[in-house]
Amino acid sequence: MVNYRMIELFIKTYIQMGILEMKKRIFALLLSASMLFALTGCGEDSELEIYRKEVESFYADVIEINDNINAIDAESENAPQKLLNELDSLNERFQEFGELEVPEEYIAVESLADEAASFMNEAVSLYHSSFSEGTFNDFSVGMAYEKYCRAILRINYIGDILQGKTLEGENINIHYEDEEE
């Protein structure tokens, strides 16, 4: 018999690590993005203003889903299903975020959002397969967590870009528009 409560706690811990890192950046991101978009936007319905609202909504929804995950009673018989439902909601928001129209000024964000959506979709699929048929597959959980971390990393990169920061790190290549190829 699989101990789903322990598995659910294990998965929640990994998910919280990624979300907590993202939560640290959200306030600064929203403040910076609001100020940046306010300075560059020229009307209430400008493309930048619409995008800003969508980004804020996305981050607020991610925080709410994280809070829902944290509120799951690990002793509950249906805890694994509740966790998977919340992960499905998270995946849905990532997919919607990946489909957003990105303003020209932030076109670099578009591919990152698409990658984040793809990685989150793979992660949630692997989390579901980890619980399939009453068995637990720790390899699938490990792979799911890796995909999850990649999705969160790209969301963090998006936050940095919207704050005007220059991305740094391994495997990051920056190409400027005025460079000749």
Regions inferred by a protein language model and the residue ranges of each:
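Sec-dependent signal peptide recognition
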Residues: 24-32
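C-terminal motif of bacterial Sec signal peptides marking the signal peptidase cleavage site
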Residues: 38-41
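Bacterial signal peptide processing site
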Residues: 43-45
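Alpha-helical segments in soluble extracytoplasmic regions
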Residues: 47-180
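Short, Lys/Arg-enriched N-terminal segments with co-localized hydrophobic residues
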Residues: 1-21
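Short alpha-helical segments used as structural interaction elements across diverse proteins
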Residues: 21-22, 151
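Intrinsically disordered, low-complexity segments enriched in polar/charged small residues
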Residues: 10-13, 29-30, 170
